[in-house]
Each structure stands twice: as structure tokens, then as C-alpha cells.
């Protein structure tokens, strides 16, 4: 089977950019952890070799497991039974393979069990996973939600939740509601503090939540009584193991059916405040969505790569007038146009990732 990394020289090209010298030094803090962790690099060349080796593993899993499962995953889809989501069997295989390979929490610090990868390397992995199965990318890349806990959570929250993500726990960001889509400041899911239990309680409905039955949720909720704008919203962490959230239904979609898009009902669900009150939308969601936008860009590039390969394969095998249609100028022009746009968008993606790292 193909290795999506070693068979794609254009990906290796982006990892060898001159700015990687500076990016690695910043990410590794001048290799301060070289004596603390056995797998921490001791110099630039060692770090680059680590990235290469891990990306080769990602490429192998994509070629051997995720891509072959993609069609059956889309046919089978995720299902909802008794208020919970059950992934397609192929999705479970994909998750199991990446968990065993230690590819959850790739960008998280080593002290929590992560690989401490820079954004460029993580986007290279996301590019390949998206090419193999766009629906699985929706699930796997949500590990990046852990960045919000890392940036704004308390130290005990980081140690508890991020370490679980690095061991394979799934995540979701529960933002939109029936009457609050793009207009997130209208969100009404209610958060009230339970003095007796010493925790927050969440009540209400969330809709169109990707991977809505995940292990760990970041939830946008209204914590300030009487407010109507974004300044009354806070960010909370909900742990599925505490119960209190039911999946009412999975949305029917035209594609990416392996990724469950859920409607959730919160019924007095126990939650923890992440960061400070009132900053849920105006600070934390804004930071969260910046990372999400980059992930969706990587997904778009991966899908484009898969579409380009399908177009080339078809144009080479489909024959008309005694020759493959790729030899006809109009078709060759279309294929060349696809490739040009693909290369341009990929260049923008990795240039943006470099800016994020620096």
C-alpha cells in the first residue's frame, strides 16, 4: 500500500523550508528537554529526523488503514443509540491505529504525554489524514481543542485533561445552538454554579456539534444571569464520564458520514470553568477558532489532493477517439488547472502554519 508521506515529495518539501531552523529552536526552547525525556531531540537535525519518522508512520497508517476504510465508513456512518454515538467499525480501527502509534496530542507538551510538534508538522499530518478520509480528519484533528485548555486552563486541568487526550481521548467544541449559529453571542445554554456540589451545571441544547459524543467537551455557555451579549458567556469543560448529556440525534449529511454531527441535550451536566468568567466568546472561542480554521484549511488541501489524484487516474484510463482523454488539450488543461490551484492552496496553508509557529 502507498505511504502518503514518502510517496509525496511535495510534503517533504514543506518540512525542509529554511524557517524550520527557527521554528524548531522556538518549539524546543533551545532543546531544554533533551535530558528530561528520552524522545526529546538534542539538536535541529535530531528534531527534523523525529518529525520525518513520525510523519512516515502517519503516512503508512493513512495508506494502509484509513484510506482503505474510507468508503465503508461513509456507507456505514456513525449511528445514535440510547443517547450515545457509535462510530463506524472502520472509524474505530482508524482511532485504534493512531492511539497505538501515539499520534493523539501531537502538538501538546511532552510533560502531558504529547509530542510537542510544531504547527507545520501537525498540519502535514492533517493534510495526509484528510486525503485518506475527510470525515476521520474531523474527529482526529479535534485533539487540537486541547490547545485551549493548555492556553487558558488551570494547571490541574491541564494535567488531567491534556494527558487524557494524549492517551487517546476524543474532543469536541460545543458552540452552536438552534438559534445561535454564526451569531454565537446569542448562545443561551445556561451555566449555573452549584454551591453544594462545588461545580457548574449546564442546561440547554447544542446543535450541529461535530463529534458531539466525545470524551471531553469544550462548551460555550451563558454564566451571567440577565446578559444577552457575548460578555455573558464563559467556557466550560464537560467530561463525558460525569454524565448529563444525551445525543438526541445525528444530522443526515450528503457526505463525511463517518463524522457524527450531533444535537446534544444538557441536563444538569456537571462542568468546570475554563479560564475566567465572561471571556468564553470574546477570548477563548476566538483563539479556538483560529486553530480550527487552519485545521479546516489542511482538510481542504487533503481533499483537493485526493480529488486531483482521482481526476488524473480517470483521465488516464478513460479512452475516447482511440486515446486516453488526458491527451486531449481541454482535459489536460482542466487537470493542470486543478494541480495549479492545489499547489497554490498548499503553499498558503504551510506559509500560514509557519507564521503560527513563529
Please annotate each region the language model reported.
Residues 199, 203-245:
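A short core secondary-structure module
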Residues 141-142, 153-189, 198, 353, ...:
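Internal maturation/activation junctions in enzymes
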Residues 81-96, 100-108, 172-201, 205-216:
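Flexible, glycine/threonine-enriched loop-and-boundary segments that flank and lead into catalytic domains
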Residues 179-182, 208-211, 227, 253-260:
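Short Gly/Pro-enriched turn/cap motifs at secondary-structure boundaries
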Residues 1-136, 156, 160:
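Amphipathic, small/basic residue-rich leader segments at the start of a protein or domain
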Residues 76-86, 109-115, 143-152, 175-180, ...:
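Conserved short loop/turn motifs at secondary-structure junctions
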Residues 241-244, 248, 253, 260-292, ...:
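A glycine-rich, basic-preceded beta-loop-alpha segment at the flavin cofactor/substrate interface
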Residues 293-358:
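Extended amphipathic alpha-helical segments enriched in small hydrophobics
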Amino acid at each position: 500500500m502507498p505511504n502518503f508521506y514518502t510517496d509525496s515529495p511535495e510534503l517533504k518539501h514543506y518540512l525542509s523550508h529554511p524557517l524550520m531552523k527557527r521554528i524548531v529552536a522556538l518549539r524546543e526552547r533551545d532543546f531544554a528537554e533533551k535530558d528530561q525525556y528520552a524522545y526529546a531531540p538534542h539538536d535541529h537535525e535530531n528534531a527534523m529526523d523525529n518529525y520525518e519518522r513520525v510523519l512516515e508512520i502517519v503516512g503508512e497508517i493513512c495508506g494502509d488503514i484509513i484510506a482503505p476504510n474510507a468508503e465503508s465508513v461513509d456507507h456505514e456512518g456513525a449511528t445514535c443509540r440510547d443517547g450515545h454515538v457509535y462510530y463506524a467499525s472502520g472509524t474505530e480501527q482508524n482511532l485504534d491505529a493512531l492511539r497505538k502509534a501515539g499520534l493523539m496530542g501531537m502538538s501538546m507538551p511532552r510533560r502531558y504525554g504529547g509530542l510537542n510538534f510544531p504547527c507545520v508538522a501537525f498540519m502535514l499530518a492533517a493534510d495526509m489524514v484528510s486525503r485518506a478520509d475527510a470525515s476521520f480528519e474531523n474527529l482526529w484533528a479535534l485533539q487540537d481543542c486541547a490547545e485551549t485548555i493548555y492556553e487558558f486552563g488551570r494547571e490541574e486541568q491541564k494535567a488531567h485533561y491534556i494527558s487524557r487526550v494524549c492517551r487517546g481521548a476524543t474532543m469536541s467544541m460545543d458552540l452552536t445552538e438552534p438559534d445561535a449559529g454564526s451569531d454565537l453571542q446569542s448562545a443561551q445554554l445556561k451555566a449555573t454554579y452549584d454551591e453544594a456540589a462545588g461545580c457548574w451545571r449546564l442546561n440547554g441544547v447544542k446543535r450541529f456539534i461535530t463529534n458531539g459524543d466525545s470524551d471531553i467537551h469544550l462548551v460555550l455557555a451563558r454564566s451571567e444571569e440577565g446578559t444577552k451579549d457575548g460578555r455573558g458567556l464563559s467556557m466550560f469543560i464537560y467530561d463525558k464520564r460525569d454524565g448529563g448529556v444525551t445525543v438526541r440525534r445525528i444530522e443526515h449529511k450528503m457526505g463525511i458520514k463517518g463524522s457524527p454531527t450531533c444535537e446534544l441535550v444538557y441536563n444538569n451536566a456537571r462542568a468546570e470553568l475554563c479560564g475566567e468568567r465572561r471571556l468564553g466568546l470574546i477570548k477563548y472561542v476566538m483563539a479556538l477558532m483560529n486553530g480550527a480554521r487552519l485545521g479546516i484549511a489542511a482538510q481542504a488541501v487533503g481533499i483537493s489532493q485526493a480529488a486531483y489524484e482521482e481526476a488524473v487516474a480517470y483521465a488516464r484510463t478513460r479512452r475516447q477517439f482511440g486515446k486516453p482523454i488526458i491527451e486531449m488539450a481541454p482535459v489536460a488543461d482542466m487537470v493542470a488547472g486543478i494541480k495549479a490551484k492545489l499547489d497554490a492552496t498548499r503553499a498558503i496553508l504551510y506559509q500560514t502554519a509557519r507564521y503560527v509557529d513563529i
